[in-house]
Amino acid sequence: MTQTPEALTTEQFKQAIIDKGQYYHIYHPFHVMMYEGKATQQQIQAWVANRYYYQINIPLKDAAIMANCPDQRVRQEWIQRMIDQDGEYPDGGGREAWLRLAEAVGLSREQVISEELVLPGVRFAVDAYVNFARRASWREAASSSLTELFAPQIHQSRLESWPQHYPWIDDKGYEYFRSRLSQARRDVEHGLTITLDSFTTHEQQQRMLEILQFKLDILWSILDALTLAYVHNEAPYHSVTQERVWHKGLFK
C-alpha cells in the first residue's frame, strides 16, 4: 500500500510559499530593465497602460472571492481590498492613483481607460485570473493573492530607482506605489492566515502551491507579452500591419 505523504508543518508550508518568491515578476527582464533605468518612455508607458487592465480587474477578482465565501468575518476583512482599489465615492482609490501615474508618464487618462493599448496576451492573462477566482473555492482563490508577499519589495524598488533614472516622471505618479507598501503587508497577513489554516494535508498544500505558481505564471506572462511587443518590436500582427487591430475587450 502506498503511504500518503505527510503534510508539511505550518512553518515548512509557510517557507514553501515564501520560496515561490524566486519566480516573482520582479526578476523578469522587463522589470529589471525598468529598475536599471534602461527602459524608454514608450516602454514605461506601455507597462503602465497594460498594467491598468490588471489593476481594474483586481476588485472583480476580490468580489468573486467574497461572492463565494460564506464566512462573514472573512468578507468583512476582504472587502477592504476592494475599497483600496476602487475607493469610496467620490475618492477613486488605487484606480485613480494609477491613472495619475499614467498622466505622470505622459499618457492621457482617456487613452488608458479606453484600453486601446492593452495587448491581447495581457488581457488573456488577467481574464484567466478573474475567471479562476470565480470558479475556484474562495479559499483557493484567496490563496492565489499571496504573491502580495513579495509586493512590498517591488513597490520599494520602483520608488528607489524610478525617480533616479526617469526624472521626467512627475512625483505625484508614485502615490500608488507608496500606498501599497502598507496595504500589501496588511493583506498578506490576512491571506496567509487563511491559507495556513485552510490547507493542512499534503495534497491540499501541493495544490495551493500549484495555484500560487499559476498566479506567478500570470504575472510573468504579462511581461512576456510586453517584451515581445515593446522590446523585440513584435506586437500582434506585426508581420501584417503596424496598426493595433487586436480586439479591445468584448465585455466592458
From Swiss-Prot:
Question: What's the name of the protein?
Answer: Pyrroloquinoline-quinone synthase
Q: Which Pfam families match?
A: TENA_THI-4
Give the catalysed reaction(s), semicolon-separated. Answer: 6-(2-amino-2-carboxyethyl)-7,8-dioxo-1,2,3,4,7,8-hexahydroquinoline-2,4-dicarboxylate + 3 O2 = pyrroloquinoline quinone + 2 H2O2 + 2 H2O + H(+)
Q: Which NCBIfam families match?
A: PQQ_syn_pqqC
Q: Which HAMAP family match?
A: PQQ_syn_PqqC (MF_00654)
Broad EC category: oxidoreductase
Disulfide bridge map: none
GO biological process, any: pyrroloquinoline quinone biosynthetic process
Gene name of the record: pqqC
Keywords assigned: Oxidoreductase, PQQ biosynthesis
- Sum up the protein's function in the record's words: Ring cyclization and eight-electron oxidation of 3a-(2-amino-2-carboxyethyl)-4,5-dioxo-4,5,6,7,8,9-hexahydroquinoline-7,9-dicarboxylic-acid to PQQ.
The family line of this record is: Belongs to the PqqC family.
Q: Which GO terms describe its molecular function?
A: pyrroloquinoline-quinone synthase activity
Give the pathway listed in the UniProt entry for this protein.
Cofactor biosynthesis; pyrroloquinoline quinone biosynthesis
| Enzyme Commission number(s) | 1.3.3.11
